[in-house]
Amino acid sequence: MSILKAENLYKTYGDKTLFDHISFHIEENERIGLIGPNGTGKSTLLKVIAGLESIEEGEITKSGSVQVEFLHQDPELPAGQTVLEHIYSGESAVMKTLREYEKALYELGKDPENEQRQKHLLAAQAKMDANNAWDANTLAKTVLSKLGVNDVTKPVNELSGGQKKRVAIAKNLIQPADLLILDEPTNHLDNETIEWLEGYLSQYPGAVMLVTHDRYFLNRVTNRIYELERGSLYTYKGNYEVFLEKRAEREAQAEQKETKRQNLLRRELAWLRRGAKARSTKQKARIDRVETLKEQTGPQSSGSLDFAIGSHRLGKQVIEAENVMIAYDGRMLVDRFNELVIPGERIGIIGPNGIGKTTLLNALAGRHTPDGGDITIGQTVRIGYYTQDHSEMNGELKVIDYIKETAEVVKTADGDMITAEQMLERFLFPRSMQQTYIRKLSGGEKRRLYLLQVLMQEPNVLFLDEPTNDLDTETLSVLEDYIDQFPGVVITVSHDRYFLDRVVDRLIVFEGNGVISRFQGSYSDYMEESKAKKAAPKPAAEEKTAEAEPKKKRKKLSYKDQLEWDGIEDKIAQLEEKHEQLEADIAAAGSDFGKIQELMAEQAKTAEELEAAMDRWTELSLMIEELES
C-alpha cells in the first residue's frame, strides 16, 4: 500500500533543473536509498517530501494521517532544552505523556516527602499505562545508550556537532512515524554505532528513505534505489549492489539506442547530400526526420572523474615517529607511539570518536607539535592534506579562480599538460559552471572542488581526514581508483568501512588511554578477528595457572624488524615484477644496443636487490621461528 505519491514534480535552482517532472510512490515498510552526484538535489528532494520545501509544479499526496520524521544533515537543535526534553518534543499523545512523567519524576526527586508531588507522579504513571508509553520510555533510553548519549540532562546548546547529530537521530527514531527520512545519518557515528543503526532500521516499523555515502550501509539497509540524475529519477528494485548491475544494463541499452540514432542520421544525411530524386513531400519528410534526429540527445554517462594527476618523486625516507606523546585537556591521547611509514603504504587510522585520530594525523603531517617524542618527515615528501573542514574556502571566489590559485596547468600521470578549465571538466564542473561563485555550490560540490585543489598540488603523501563525508558514491569510487594508481603514500582517518576495505592494507587502531595497536589487513578482517576474540571463552584452568605462575615477558622482534617483516613480501613481489618487466623491455629494444646495455645494467642491479631481499626474508623468518619455539 502506498503511503505517499509524488506526481510530476518540477523544481529549479537558478538555471539548473533539479526535478524535471518526476513521479514516484513510497510503499509501507520500503527501505529507499536516494543516490546521485553532488548538487543534483538529493537533500532538496528529501525536504520536499517532508514538506520543508516547496515545488514549482506537481503534487505530493499522503494517504490518511501519514506522519513523517526528518533528520537534517547538520541538525540545529533549539537552545534552552536538555537532551531528554528534545528527545521527547513532539505533539503525539505518547510524547506528551513522557514529558509529563519525566517532569513529575524530576520534581519528586527534589522533594521526595511532598505528598502533592507524589500524587502527580502516580497520575503520570497511570497516564503512562493508559497510553502504552512505557515501551517508548524504554526504547528512548536504549537508543540513547546505543548512540553514546549518556547525560540526558545536558543542555543541547553545549553539545558538539557529532553529539547533536546523535541526539537528533535518537529523537527521529523514537518519534512515532510512518515515513522516516534520513539525510546522511552515518556522519559523526563510529563504526560500531553504524552497525547497530543498520540492525535497528531493518526492524523499523515504518518506511525509510535515506541519503548516505556509506555504501555498506546503503547495501544492507535498502531494498529499493532511487537515482536522481540531471533532473530525471530512475528507480531500481533491490539494494545498492543490484542497482550497480541494473544501471550498467540501462547505460548499455542507451548506448545501443544512440548508436542506432547516429547510423540512421548518417544514412539520411548521405541520401540528402546525394540529392536523390524523390517527390518533394517525401524529400521534405526526410529533412524533417534529419532535424528530429539532430535534436535528440544521446545518453550521458553517469559521470566519470579522471584523477590521473601526476605526483612528485618520493624518496625512501617518508615519515618516522619515535616515542610520540600527545595529551589534551589532561587526557592522554597518544602514549609513546612509534611508527615507520615506508613508500607505497596505505594506512587507515580507526577508533571511537574523540579519541585523537585527527590529532595524530595532524602530528604525522607536521601540523601539530607533539608533547613528547620526535616526528621526522623525509626531504622529498610533498604533503597533500584533505581535512574535514573546508570552511576556509572563499565563497566570493569563482570556481575557476579558486583552482587557478593552486595551478593554472597540471601534469597528468601520462605526462600530458592540461589546463585548470580542463581539470574542472574532468571533475564534473562544466565550463558553464566554472564561473559560479563557491558560495552557491552544494556542500558536496564544495568538497569535490576542495579535493581537486588538494590533488592539483601533486602530492606524494596524501593525508585524508574523513574523506567520504558529503561526497557522492560516484566520486568516492573514482577517488578509490585514483588511490589504486597513486604511487605515493596514503594515510587516512575514516569511519567508512567500504572505503577502508577498498584502499588500506594495514590499520593503526586507537584502543583508548593513549594505547595504539596495529593490524595487518583490511578493516573487515580486523572486525572479524575482534569479534572472535570477544566471543572466545577463556578456560578457567589456564587463567588460574597464569595467575599462579610468574609472568614471562614474551620475546618478539624489534619494532623495526617487525615493520620490515610486515612489508618484505610485498617488496619481493615488486622486485620480481620489475625484473620481469626489464626482461620484456630488453626483448623489445631490438637492435638499440645502447638501450639494451642500460636495461641490462638495471636488471642486474634489480637481481641483486631481489637476492638481498630473499636473504633478509629467510633471516627474519628464522628469527620468528626461534622466538615462537
Swiss-Prot record:
E.C. number, please?
7.-.-.-
Q: Which ranges are annotated Polar residues under compositional bias?
A: 295-304
Enzyme superclass (EC) = translocase
Note the coiled coil stretches, chain numbering. Answer: 560-629
UniProt-listed SMART domains? AAA
Residue positions annotated to bind ATP are: 36-43, 351-358
Give the compositionally biased regions (Basic and acidic residues): 285-294, 540-550
Q: Which GO terms describe its molecular function?
A: ATP binding; ATP hydrolysis activity; DNA binding
Q: Where is this region: Disordered?
A: 284-304, 530-555
Q: Does the keyword Zinc apply?
A: no
Cystine crosslinks: none
Recorded hits in Gene3D superfamilies, A to Z, give: P-loop containing nucleotide triphosphate hydrolases, Valyl-tRNA synthetase, C-terminal domain
The family database entries (InterPro entries) matched by this protein are listed as: AAA+_ATPase, ABC_tran_C, ABC_tran_Xtn, ABC_transporter-like_ATP-bd, ABC_transporter-like_CS, ABCF_ATPase, P-loop_NTPase, Val-tRNA_synth_C_sf
Pfam families tied to this protein: ABC_tran, ABC_tran_CTD, ABC_tran_Xtn
Which keywords fit this entry according to its UniProt record? ATP-binding, Coiled coil, Nucleotide-binding, Repeat, Translocase, Transport
The record places domain ABC transporter at: 4-255, 319-537
Task: Supply the PANTHER family for this chain.
Answer: ABC TRANSPORTER ATP-BINDING SUBUNIT, ABC TRANSPORTER DOMAIN-CONTAINING PROTEIN
Q: Which family does it belong to?
A: Belongs to the ABC transporter superfamily.
Task: State the protein's name.
Answer: Uncharacterized ABC transporter ATP-binding protein YfmR
What organism does the UniProt record list as the source? Bacillus subtilis (strain 168)
Recorded name of the encoding gene: yfmR
